[in-house]
């Protein structure tokens, strides 16, 4: 299977302002944006996102109903993009606080998710609720807890949400054996 890389229509070099053109740097590699004036290579890097699967002291999961697209009205665990220079684990804790109003302790890495042709790389952690009152910010319509048998599988926003929740549940069952 050949992966297709999409080059966004950037026209000018961020280093010198010269014109960018598409060029292959090495045989077999996809075309890159290269400045004709200074030679700067404009790499379209992936965007790093984090997610936090939060459980309370009774093992219920915290999910947020999205108030923004994509996935408006669908359920996700708290998450979002990592800011440049921010530690990934601190971003996961920050997103839990911002999107669900909760302070958490990260317990372990659930998995890392990426998909061909998509920019985000999603790093998902399992976490335990420590304190706070469940509350949504402007990106959420509702926040609530779900028992494992109540997860709204048909109303989850993203493939990564479904896969991470399944991986989390499978990991809990394996650990319990």
Please provide the spans of the model-predicted regions.
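Cys/His-rich short segments
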Residues: 2-47
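Conserved Nudix-box catalytic region and its N-terminal flanking loop in Nudix hydrolases
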Residues: 2-3, 56-98
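Acidic/histidine-enriched, glycine/proline-rich intrinsically disordered or flexible terminal extensions
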Residues: 2-4, 157-177
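Conserved hydrophobic/aromatic beta-strand scaffold that supports enzyme active sites
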Residues: 12, 32, 53, 63, ...
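A short coil-to-beta-strand element that immediately follows conserved catalytic motifs
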Residues: 22-24, 103-110
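N-terminal strand-loop-strand
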Residues: 29-76, 104, 108
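Active-site-adjacent beta-strand/loop module that shapes the phosphate/pyrophosphate-binding cleft
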Residues: 113-134, 144, 164, 169-172
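NUDIX/MutT-family hydrolases
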Residues: 136-165
């Amino acid at each position: 299977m050949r992966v297709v890389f999409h080059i966004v229509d950037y026209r000018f070099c961020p280093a010198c302002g010269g014109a960018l053109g598409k060029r292959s740097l090495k045989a077999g590699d996809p075309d890159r944006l290269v400045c004709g004036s200074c030679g700067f290579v404009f790499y379209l890097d992936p965007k790093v996102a984090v997610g936090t699967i939060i459980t309370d002291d009774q093992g219920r999961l915290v999910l947020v109903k999205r108030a923004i697209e994509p996935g408006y009205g669908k359920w996700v665990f708290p998450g979002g993009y990592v800011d440049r220079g921010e530690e990934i684990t601190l971003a996961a804790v920050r997103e839990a606080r911002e999107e669900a109003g909760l302070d958490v302790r990260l317990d372990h890495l659930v998995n890392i998710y990426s998909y061909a042709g998509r920019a985000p790389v999603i790093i998902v952690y399992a976490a335990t609720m420590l304190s706070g009152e469940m509350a949504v910010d402007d990106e959420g319509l509702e926040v609530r807890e779900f028992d494992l048998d109540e997860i709204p599988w048909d109303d989850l926003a993203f493939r990564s949400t479904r896969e991470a929740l399944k991986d989390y549940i499978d990991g809990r069952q394996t650990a319990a054996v």
